[in-house]
Amino acid sequence: MKSPVLLVAYLYPPDNFSGAIRAGRFAKYLRKLGHPVTVLAAAAENAGQVAEDVHRVRGEFGFGLRRDFSGYLERAIHKYFLPSDWGYGWAWRAAAYAARFMRSSPRPVVVSTFPPLVGHWVGLWLKKRYAAGWIADFRDPFWGDPVRNARQAALFDRRMERAIFRNADRVVANTDVLQEDWRRAYPQWREKMHLIWNGYDPEEGLGPLPLPPRPYQVIAHVGSIYSKRHPAQLLASAGRLTERGLLDPKRLKIRLVGTLDRDELVCRELLDSLTASGLVEIVPELPRAASQEVMATSDYLLLLDMLLDVPSVYVPAKVYEYVQVGRPILLCTTRHSPSERVLSLSGVPYRCVFTDDSAAETDRKVLEFLSLASDPAELRAEFAATFAAMPQAIELSGLIEATARMTSYPI
């Protein structure tokens, strides 16, 4: 039998958060490989053992904090000390459950995933308390992440990241750019660093569906839109092209599906104007199955990278769903981003609009993109070898077994 695993994942399916998907894939395919996997996740209320191998304890979510001491403490920590995360109270409740689990035999290898940070808090505590084998998985950068830019958290983040790298047996990055950043920052721990990209589950059966009959084409974005991930360049270009008569608003609809933080957007006036004209359609957040149907029935797909003043180190998780549909993808990103490199490996037609493109260059690219045929393309075999769930689970399984072999629990 393969080594047992305790997967500490604050977010876990069926939670409707993109951060839950990677943990769900890991658990599913590690079990296929013979690992007994127990998941420790959060819930809005204490749910206990919701499945034979999934245990949920009450967590804190920004949209529904309790009006009790734990809720007020959560708000205070979030506001004054660590504004980039939630779930601080969950960490202690989760640790109490994990302590009981660690007394079982054989003891598991702990795999924790971030964000939010509290997953690694639990992993670090289990390492310190029980000498557990520990693999720390990062779905985003941590210290130095341009998005985690709160001044009051900078010193804590740096110290916490060093503690993770010092104590974890393995650390896993989800992009090669992040892995290289780590190697420069912590050369003394290079041998701990591994790369497992985000990916996709072929068994979900996501693929193109027939396009419904309609008098217009649809370019769809599915996911959250906020200050650092927004469609301003595309909207501005669509406005200019419409004014010049090069784009017929009756023949195109830009469909934005998901949460939209209008107050944070630099393009909110333009968004309101194009929505009023009918060129833009805003659809509230949908369940995952419904959002995938939107992807599968769209002529084109819009992928928004993190648009920052520095080169992107991110790859939006949606890219792995989009490429399974196979229809053309317009990527708004920075130059030389890992998102562009992932798309280049897929075999799916795409075009990139870069943050430093001129208005004229952006307009040229948008028109060129909209001239692409919407026939779906098949994924390249080499793409699946890197990004499909089973090859990634095999890689993680190897790390788990290596960690188990080097772990010596105290008697």
What are these regions (language model features)?
Residues 39-102:
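A conserved catalytic-core segment of Leloir-type glycosyltransferases
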Residues 1-59, 170, 405-411:
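N-terminal subdomain of nucleotide-sugar transferases
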Residues 229, 287-294, 301-320, 329-341:
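Nucleotide-sugar-dependent
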Residues 211-229, 235-238:
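Conserved donor-binding/catalytic core segment of Leloir-type glycosyltransferases
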Residues 130-135, 143-163, 202:
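Nucleotide-sugar donor phosphate/pyrophosphate-binding loop at the beta->alpha transition
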Residues 162-192, 340:
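A short, active-site helix/loop in glycosyltransferases that binds the activated sugar's phosphate group
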Residues 251, 255-260, 264-292:
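Nucleotide-activated donor-binding/catalytic signature segment of Leloir-type glycosyltransferases, i.e.
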Residues 43, 177, 196-199:
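Carbohydrate-associated surface elements
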